[in-house]
Regions:
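N-terminal glycine-rich phosphate-binding loop for ADP-containing cofactors
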Residues: 1-246
Length: 246
């Protein structure tokens, strides 16, 4: 760009008419005037802006991906999908991680995994998340848009329970996990990613990190946001519990 100080990104969330959050994305050379104009624009359309530095997935999507992945990881461990979804709903999340994967498309998740692997190269972590995504993709179970994903759907697109074929590859564990442990896994995996975003300078304001989490993807509203939640828990306990779960 000839005028890099005028270059700025504006990231809306879907569905746009319902989601209140907008991320304003600063480039390395973005000037204060551009930021101010973007803030004014977002406020004029009755949305809530947060300002973050440019980075892969920005802030909100960066934190929600681990939420989805942790839900899928628990499936591969034999934890019943119903327990995972119930744990998330009881925490106040609008959608459980498995339903959210179906809603956003399993095919999209597989594409993101391939693109991220290509970008990260040897540093890309190998775990069972890609395996389950690619397996579902091969089965043609691409999510709600295909009327077949982790959930079954009727001809009108209404969910009709979990797909039992999932247990062919990932049989249920003989032991049922503690609900609190499942909830902590879902919470901590997001909170730690928010901390990393703050440490790396993607997120510049703790308050905006909390607001972005609650408005952007519905992080347990009662908690005040991931960073406030860690503060409530206290550093010693949060650090110890993170080591145990993540």
């Amino acid at each position: 760009s000839k005028y890099p100080e005028n270059y700025i990104g504006i990231h809306f969330f879907s569905p746009v008419e319902k989601m209140l959050l907008v991320e304003i994305i600063k480039g390395e050379k973005t000037g204060n005037r551009a930021v101010a104009k973007a803030l004014d624009f977002v406020r004029q359309i009755k949305k809530t802006p947060i300002v973050v530095n440019d980075s892969r997935f920005f802030y909100a999507n960066r934190c929600i991906i681990p939420y989805l992945n942790e839900g899928l990881r628990m499936i591969t461990e034999g934890i019943p999908p119903s327990i995972i979804e119930s744990a998330a709903k009881q925490l106040g999340f609008p959608l459980g991680p498995i339903q959210l994967v179906d809603e956003t498309s399993i095919e999209l998740g597989a594409k993101i995994a391939r693109a991220t692997r290509a970008a990260m190269g040897k540093s890309y972590p190998n775990d069972q998340i890609d395996e389950i995504l690619f397996w579902m993709e091969d089965k043609g179970r691409l999510g709600r848009k295909a009327n077949a994903g982790f959930f079954n759907y009727n001809e009108n697109g209404k969910r009709e329970g979990f797909w039992t074929g999932l247990q062919e590859k990932y049989p249920l564990s003989k032991t049922t996990p503690n609900l609190t442990e499942v909830q902590h896994r879902l919470m901590f995996i997001q909170a730690l990613e928010a901390v990393r975003a703050l440490e790396e300078g993607v997120l510049m304001d703790i308050r905006e990190g909390d607001v972005g989490a609650v408005l952007g993807w519905g992080f347990a509203p009662w908690s005040g946001g991931p960073l406030s939640w860690l503060d409530i828990l206290g550093t010693p306990y949060a650090a110890e519990r993170s080591q145990e779960l993540c």
